Amino acid sequence: MAGPRGALLAWCRRQCEGYRGVDIRDLSSSFRDGLAFCAILHRHRPDLLDFDSLSKDNVFENNRLAFEVAEKELGIPALLDPNDMVSMSVPDCLSIMTYVSQYYNHFAGSGPAGVSSPRKGLVLSSPPSEASTPADPGDRAQGEECSSGSLSKQGSHRTPSSTCAACQQHVHLVQRYLADGKLYHRHCFRCRRCSSTLLPGAYRNGPEEGTFVCAEHCARLGPSGRSGARPGTPPQPKQQQLTEEAKEVEGGSPSPKATAGAEADVPKASPEGRPQVPTKPRVPGRPQELASPPASRPTPAPRKASESTAPTPPTPRPRSSLQQENLVEQGGGSGLVNGKLQEPPIPKPRGTPKLSERTPAPRKDPPWITLVQAEPKKKPAPLPPSSSPGPPPGQEGRQVENGGVDKAAPRGPEPKPYNPFEEEEEEPPAAPSPAPGPAPTPPESTPKSLHPWYGITPTSSPKTKKRPAPRAPSTSPLTLHASRLSRSEPPSATPSPALSVESLSSESSSQAPSEELLEPPVVPKSSSEPAVHAPGTPGTSASLSANSSLSSSGELVQPSMDRTPQASPGLAPNSRGSPGPPPAKPCSGTAPTPLVLVGDKSPAPSPGTSSPQLQVKSSCKENPFNRKPSPTASPSVKKATKGSKPARPPAPGHGFPLIKRKVQSDQYIPEEDIHGEIDTIERQLDALEHRGVLLEEKLRGGVNEGREDDMLVDWFKLIHEKHLLVRRESELIYVFKQQNLEQRQADVEYELRCLLNKPEKDWTEEDRGREKVLMQELVTLIEQRNAIVNCLDEDRQREEEEDKMLEAMIKKKEFQKETEPEGKKKGKFKTMKVLKLLGNKRDTKSKCPGDRS
């Protein structure tokens, strides 16, 4: 016969030619000993097995070796069982043909020189066609041996393994799935709990016999609600069975293995490589994962920081949102500035506030700056409780009270001003003033940046507008005032009456604790945020004028100088424009500097005052770091800087902000999309199985020879299509598992960082044990991800090669005219058409008419 069966038989003969003990006379008994399968595998992949070591008498081992190698290495699912091959003297012809056709699909395109090019083309183009393609005119004679009658004769014959081990129902060829030497319906081999497709080596026996459970349960991948129809139906009602199976068919098809083994059968795979999965909203097992991937990927370090930060901006400023997230919880309840109790972001002098979406690390101006501005503007620095006649603590007063002095009380009656340095456990404040503990929390103190670094920046001077309220440090009110001045960011140029030195001094005397207030430097506001934001609080101007008057008084000047080391003039650092935090707490120094100059009683202070104000404003608009000090103040600033010379604080060690990194592959597929595509594949597989059962019945029931050839072509094509769908389904399951591993890796890494963030001296034995466990788990996760990635890459490579071979075949001279339309479709041309074409060719080309007989 010149049909597909003859072509397949001829191809097998050519592949096994020259191998001892292998004689291909038909597509049934000739394959019983398993040597023919091994010979085909060895010819194309001699590295997979040692043919010379095989014995013709060892039927079971030969077949077992061939089936296992084909499944694991080539992704060809085993439709046959070694025990059946041993028990039957004449194996089922249709089963052999179906199984060998997959070898043909896989190898024909890349077959040895012995295989003709036309054959190769056919092979790749369609699994069914493979049978017909290989046969040469001379080969057809032998192909006839397997007459159509053989199939019908075997129609009633059922192999011993045709019963499903799970549901005890008959299993048709198109439904077969072999696992651990047992036969199952494809839809029966699924996880009992989550109904997802079982992957090779990733399942264990369930509580009941014949059931299986995933090694690791994932969000349900199988089609929703379909798992219930698990039991197979009796073979007789094929349609019913298929329908039921269709519903049941979740994904437990042999494909998982095939995928792992890298199925290369048909080029079709290439389009599937990573097709866009139908976006079908299903069970969003990990919605967060899906949503976050885009953002997390781009951000190098702070990918996941945003998650943790749930900013609640007290006073939304243009940029406060960013800082809020970054801010660490402030000591005082009110101290919690916009920022959440988030780990301090790495200070970045300038960043675009847009990063706020990624709250993790404010890239713009130091988040502390924004935060400070937002809150401090509204709330003046709290005056020392004793002397401050200003508004009650609860009251936020930006306006200057008592002669223009900013006396607004702290937000709350909190006596402790938030000390950013103190809050940062790890980093001692580089604050210029050695303030003992946080005094009444100045509103701005709350915004203290998360990290001591932040407090360190002298640039903040423009920032502290509200601070103008004199804090009477024990050293001198002037110092307090100066520090305030440096920090204070003149809300407005409104010249409020200079603070009277008396008021200052009285306040200073009354408030010894004010020193502390002074010490907590206000977080410098980023230049990007205009100082203008703060309503023109006369406090700043008042403080400036106060400074001048104080400086004239002279007595205060010295104390301020003493403090100078701590408070190196903020101007100097600003002039440097250093992006990093300037020397510790030089901000306070700004005020002192003018004071020192004033000490000479020169009127410079007042000009200085105005200039600082202007500078402050400008600095708000521009980056404070780049701001240049006013000429009058610069000398003193320089001196102060030299004197205090606060060293830049070292990068935070244990206090480094913890960011949950999102581990994600480049091609992320939302979980809902994976579920949707798997549902679609399941429906297609159900339909194919339904057709396959009916087709198998017809083939076994007996049909005329001409009709049988057409049916065989359809059969091979159907088997191949099923194989491709199963492969894609398996790939999706691997992708889903990979994404779960990625999520788990992110969690483990974050937990490990949290552990390592703790000073080693504070570690307990439990911490050390936990570290080892986490490290081991991390290594395991990475290895598992690597294995899946390698497997998927191999599959993709093989599919690309198949596509290339298919294209080459289509262009072959012999098929150019006939297959030109198909060639345009690349892998999508009709298999049946090509097979028929080949059959006609064979008739016209045959050199020996006698070959047919």
Curated annotation (Swiss-Prot):
Keyword field contains Coiled coil: yes
UniProt feature, compositional bias: Polar residues: 145-162, 607-618
Residues annotated as domain Calponin-homology (CH): 2-108
Biased composition (Basic and acidic residues): 355-366
Swiss-Prot/TrEMBL keywords: Cell membrane, Cell projection, Coiled coil, Cytoplasm, Cytoskeleton, Endocytosis, Endosome, LIM domain, Membrane, Metal-binding, Phosphoprotein, Protein transport, Transport, Zinc
PTM annotation (Phosphothreonine): residues: 312, 315, 457, 459
Superkingdom per UniProt: Eukaryota
Residue ranges, annotated region (Necessary and sufficient to associate with tubular recycling endosome membranes, mediate phosphatidic acid-binding and membrane tubulation): 690-853
Protein role: Lipid-binding protein with higher affinity for phosphatidic acid, a lipid enriched in recycling endosome membranes. On endosome membranes, acts as a downstream effector of Rab proteins recruiting cytosolic proteins to regulate membrane tubulation. Involved in a late step of receptor-mediated endocytosis regulating for instance endocytosed-EGF receptor trafficking. Alternatively, regulates slow endocytic recycling of endocytosed proteins back to the plasma membrane. Also involved in cargo protein delivery to the plasma membrane.
Free-text note on domains in this protein's UniProt record: Probably exists in a closed and an opened conformation due to interaction of the C-terminal RAB-binding domain (RBD), also described as bivalent Mical/EHBP Rab binding (bMERB) domain, with the N-terminal calponin-homology (CH) domain. The conformational change is regulated by RAB13 and may modulate MICALL1 interactions with functional partners.
bMERB domain boundaries: 661-808
Protein name as annotated: MICAL-like protein 1
PTM annotation (Phosphoserine): residues: 292, 306, 388, 460-461, 474, 476, 568, 611, 730
UniProt entry tagged with the keyword Nucleotide-binding: no
Organism: Bos taurus (Bovine)
GO molecular function, one term: metal ion binding
Coiled coil: 671-701, 791-820
Disordered, as annotated region: 118-162, 224-659
Membrane topology: Peripheral membrane protein
SUPFAM superfamilies: Calponin-homology domain, CH-domain, Glucocorticoid receptor-like (DNA-binding domain)
Gene name as annotated: MICALL1
Annotated Gene Ontology cellular component terms: centriole; ciliary membrane; cilium; cytoplasmic side of endosome membrane; late endosome; late endosome membrane; recycling endosome membrane
